[in-house]
Amino acid sequence: NVDVNKIRVSIQNYGSSGNDLSGPSVFFYEWPTNSGRGYVAYQALYVGAMVTTDGGEERPLVTITHRSDQEGNSMMWEPVPGYLNPNSTKIAISDDESTWPPSWPDKSADENDPGWSGSWNGYFGKNQFNAGQEVFYKVSDDRNYIVGHPYTPDTTDVTRKGAGILVGVRAMEWKQILIEDVIFLLHEVQNDG
């Protein structure tokens, strides 16, 4: 949950925030914090693309949350491994070092400090704690597919499906009076296929 200012909300690491009905400790967008008043129930990331099937046909593909095929296999945004502490039940959040991964996969190429081990992967840079609270994770659409229309979005990894999309997601709150009623949700969408 992010709750450092007057908004409290639960963040899920599959592209959504708010109350996904998964339990009593999951919060909708509550304002002010601890008032029980909800203003937004749920927010989710939707991304659509036209993909070319192996047969040369163009088909639409939209990735959303809470979607599965008839066998129960996920077809939704899924967390990219490595962006949370595997020994924690929480998402990586700036004000709780126990939620951070041992190293950050997207920082492994840093020549001076590969993986930024023991450091926060902040929007404003390494160990930059500008926001009162900041959540960071990545999702991919690798499990989504078009039923009955095979295609290969990434020729370097044929196990991937979806549109080959990676999304870096951040939620940030500040306690400063001018923005104490605001949460910033940033979605950095990358075509990785």
Question: What do the PLM-derived regions correspond to, one by one?
Answer:
Residues 1-193:
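A long-range scaffold signal marking pre-active-site subdomains of enzyme folds
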